A protein has these predicted regions:
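Extracytoplasmic ligand-binding site segments that recognize negatively charged/polar headgroups
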Residues: 1-106
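Solvent-exposed loop/turn segments at secondary-structure junctions
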Residues: 14-15, 23-25, 44, 52-56, ...
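Sec-exported extracytoplasmic/periplasmic mature domains
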Residues: 39-43, 60-65, 83, 87, ...
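Conserved C-terminal helix/tail region of periplasmic/extracytoplasmic solute-binding proteins
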Residues: 100, 204-238
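Mature extracytoplasmic/periplasmic domains
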Residues: 141, 146-207
Length: 238
């Protein structure tokens, strides 16, 4: 829905690296980008996100490819990159538990959504958020009304409620994800706001190497199958 003809965004952001400033050298992040997840210095001290889409995005971007590639060769290279990571780095593959775990400083770094990183940084000032120069995923969460909705008028009212200032403010301030309401975004990130100075709350925009996912069912199936094999490799790693 490139023109937002059928959907209304309520959150937006990026996927990047959350890191403990006391354990991770910023020079390593700047030099390696996503390759830091294969840096032996951080072996056993990283989180990967249990999402085939985000994990393959990371690998493809580390290799210099588009995250929307359908090339069998490039997807195979990304698969091999991830297998190398899980076999040598002993990552912990997690989902939402990364939020509290990183807020408590349990590992040095992890792959994370910007909204979750903003929450982590608000809870722990020793945490930072880094976006590699190779680019990343620029995403949005949106609401749609199905064509066969039984009460479209009420659905529109709900969308208006979530999108207006009060609803959008409460939603964004509670979870840490960046609001699609410009006024709310400016308030929360600005002076005196709950996320003042927290870079993860203000997503990078206009960067040419950042991409929005383009849905491809065949590629989705391929990546899902390969990610299952990556997790098997992780479980068999010594």
């Amino acid at each position: 829905d490139p023109n937002n003809d059928y959907s209304i965004p309520y959150f937006w952001g990026t996927v990047g690296i959350v890191y403990d400033k006391n354990q991770v050298d910023i020079e390593d992040l700047e030099r390696e980008g996503f390759e830091i997840f294969r840096d032996p210095k951080y072996r056993g001290n990283i989180y990967l996100y249990d999402s085939e889409r985000d994990s393959f995005m990371m690998a493809l971007k580390a290799l210099g490819y588009s995250m929307n590639t359908s090339s069998e060769k490039e997807l195979q290279e990304a698969y091999e990159w991830l297998v190398s990571c899980v076999q040598t780095m002993k990552p912990e593959i997690v989902t939402d538990e990364i939020i509290d775990n990183m807020a408590q400083g349990r590992k040095a770094l992890g792959l994370i959504y910007s909204g979750d990183a903003a929450y982590v940084m608000a809870e722990n000032e020793d945490m930072g958020y880094y976006l590699p120069e190779s680019g990343t995923n620029l995403w949005s969460d949106a609401m749609v009304i199905p064509a066969n909705a039984k009460n479209p008028e009420l659905a529109h009212e709900f969308i208006n409620f979530v999108s207006d200032y009060e609803g959008a403010y409460d939603n964004s301030s509670f979870v840490g994800y960046t609001s699609a309401n410009q006024e709310v975004m400016d308030t929360l990130y600005g002076e005196g706001g709950e996320y003042e100075g927290i870079d993860a709350y203000m997503p990078r925009s206009g960067y040419p190497k950042d991409e929005v996912f383009e849905y491809n069912e065949d590629t989705r199936k391929t990546i899902a199958n390969l990610w299952s094999k990556v997790k098997i490799a992780a479980s068999n790693a010594e």
